[in-house]
């Protein structure tokens, strides 16, 4: 959390210790952020009162004057500011509230394979980020159920967000890179796919940078991210070479999980299960305000998660749709200009969680 008054560097070893430093009343029983028995340390930028700091002798703190930004902008003699390569188009509140978790049922063996691989990734992520059985949702409806016996803590959510977003930007970059090389080899246009895929990857990275403004993973989490990214990049690389269709379906299912994750977080904020994020004085990073062009009065943590969830809903619809197209010949319907026909206009991927069929967007 970014505060204009005070910033403390904290070595966070458990959700309970996070609760102590932020004034949240929790039990004193120790717990770990990872299911592997290792504590995940985070450096949090947070406004902390004097009364709280008097009871945190186990933490090493750095005064605000000595606390550096995690990724500061380097000052140059001439350049004042570097704007985003892909400015965000923004959403209306109605569009963001209309996003709901949905699941596209597998219609073929390849779809079923992609779905099961995503479920395997979800299982591994739950273990890696320390999600306990009582914190898991109904396994019979894993993509749509958002209620659990016990909510996650703010620290658990941040660990989960950072881990997920650190690899979520990989698929779009891999697919865009391979399509770029294919276009060069075939001496043919790509028909607009590359731009959308790279923009998706860029958008996911902005999600990560936003959460990194709130906390920094410790060495163990960084090691996990390094390993996961290496495995995931190579897996996506080989997968896209073999079958772009299956890969886009896999990413579509992965984005279903992302929409589900952020929907559950919004629900827990609204129910008051995350008191620090429900605090009206909680300040989201300026990076987020600038990127999403968030208006005054709509800059709470809930609003931030609404914007990010809407992004994931767009990625969900885009990838499910691209999986239905001929990846060698069909143009990208989301950047194409359509003929003057009221019945066929540029589709909005957020409005079709299961993706558009080829006949709906190509003809």
UniProtKB/Swiss-Prot annotation:
GO biological process: alternative respiration
Domain of life: Eukaryota
Residues given in the record as Fe cation 1 binding sites: 165, 204, 207, 312
Record's keyword terms, sorted: Electron transport, Iron, Membrane, Metal-binding, Mitochondrion, Mitochondrion inner membrane, Oxidoreductase, Respiratory chain, Transit peptide, Transmembrane, Transmembrane helix, Transport
Location(s) in or outside the cell: Mitochondrion inner membrane
Membrane topology reported for the UniProt record: Multi-pass membrane protein
Protein's UniProt keywords contain Acetylation: no
CC cofactor: Fe cation
Function: Catalyzes cyanide-resistant oxygen consumption. May increase respiration when the cytochrome respiratory pathway is restricted, or in response to low temperatures.
Protein name (Swiss-Prot/TrEMBL): Alternative oxidase, mitochondrial
Species for this entry: Podospora anserina (Pleurage anserina)
């Amino acid at each position: 959390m970014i505060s204009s008054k005070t910033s403390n560097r904290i070595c966070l070893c458990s959700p309970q210790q996070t609760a102590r430093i932020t004034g949240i009343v929790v039990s004193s029983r120790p717990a770990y952020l990872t299911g592997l028995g290792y504590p995940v340390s985070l450096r949090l930028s947070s406004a902390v009162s004097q009364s709280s700091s008097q009871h945190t002798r186990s933490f090493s703190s750095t005064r605000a004057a000595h606390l550096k930004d995690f990724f500061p902008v380097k000052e140059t003699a001439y350049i004042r500011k570097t704007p985003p390569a892909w400015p965000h188009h923004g959403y209306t509140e109605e569009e963001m509230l209309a996003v709901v978790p949905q699941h596209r049922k597998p219609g073929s063996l390849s779809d079923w394979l992609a779905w099961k691989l995503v479920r395997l990734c979800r299982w591994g992520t739950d273990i890696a980020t320390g999600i306990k059985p009582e914190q898991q949702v109904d396994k019979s409806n894993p993509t749509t159920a958002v209620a659990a016996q016990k909510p996650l803590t703010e620290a658990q959510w941040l660990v989960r967000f950072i881990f997920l977003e650190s690899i979520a930007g990989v698929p779009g970059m891999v697919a865009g890179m391979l399509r770029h090389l294919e276009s060069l080899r075939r001496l043919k246009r790509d028909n607009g796919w590359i731009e959308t895929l790279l923009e998706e990857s860029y958008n996911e990275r902005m999600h990560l940078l936003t959460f990194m403004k709130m906390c920094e993973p410790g060495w163990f989490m960084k090691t996990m991210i390094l390993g996961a990214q290496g495995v995931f990049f190579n897996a996506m690389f080989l997968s896209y070479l073999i079958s772009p269709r299956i890969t886009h379906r896999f990413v579509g299912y992965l984005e279903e999980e992302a929409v589900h994750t952020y929907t559950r977080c919004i629900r827990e904020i609204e129910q008051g299960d995350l008191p620090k994020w429900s605090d009206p004085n909680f300040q989201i990073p300026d990076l987020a305000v600038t990127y999403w062009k968030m208006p005054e009065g709509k800059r709470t943590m809930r609003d931030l998660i609404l914007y990010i969830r809407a992004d994931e809903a767009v990625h969900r619809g885009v990838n499910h749709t691209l999986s239905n197209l001929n990846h060698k010949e069909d143009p990208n319907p989301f950047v194409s200009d359509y003929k003057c026909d009221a019945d066929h206009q540029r589709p909005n991927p957020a409005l079709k969680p299961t993706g558009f069929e080829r006949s709906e967007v190509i003809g």
